[in-house]
């Protein structure tokens, strides 16, 4: 299992924090695997700075754009990461 530190914009950070968003769509350049820990670090892109707020989640499911089972519309090289609480 790996730990991945990822920037996340405020609107997506809050949706995950409030429980209304349970996935992340990411460029799959890190070798994500089920069981990996994500440290989501809130980042204000327009200002170019971190806010200091973080959320930790666990990858519970992965659908990759280059998998035969992946739904149409997901670009090759990207992945949908189903995320859940860290145990």
Model-derived regions, located:
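Compositionally biased, charged N-terminal/linker segments
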Residues: 1-26
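A structural micro-motif recognizing beta-strand termini
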Residues: 26-29, 84-86
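Short, charged beta-turn/beta-strand-edge "cap" motif at the junction between a beta-strand
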Residues: 28-29, 43-48
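Short beta-strand-centered aromatic/proline hotspots
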Residues: 47-63
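Glycine- and charge-enriched low-complexity intrinsically disordered segments
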Residues: 62-87
């Amino acid at each position: 299992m790996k730990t991945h530190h990822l920037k996340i914009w405020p609107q997506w950070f809050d949706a995950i924090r409030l429980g209304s968003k349970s996935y992340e769509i990411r460029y799959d350049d890190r070798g994500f695997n089920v069981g990996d820990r994500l440290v989501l670090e809130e980042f204000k892109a327009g200002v170019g700075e971190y806010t200091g707020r973080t959320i930790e989640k666990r990858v519970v499911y992965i659908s990759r754009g280059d998998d035969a089972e992946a739904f149409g519309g997901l670009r090759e090289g990207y992945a949908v990461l189903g995320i859940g609480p860290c145990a």
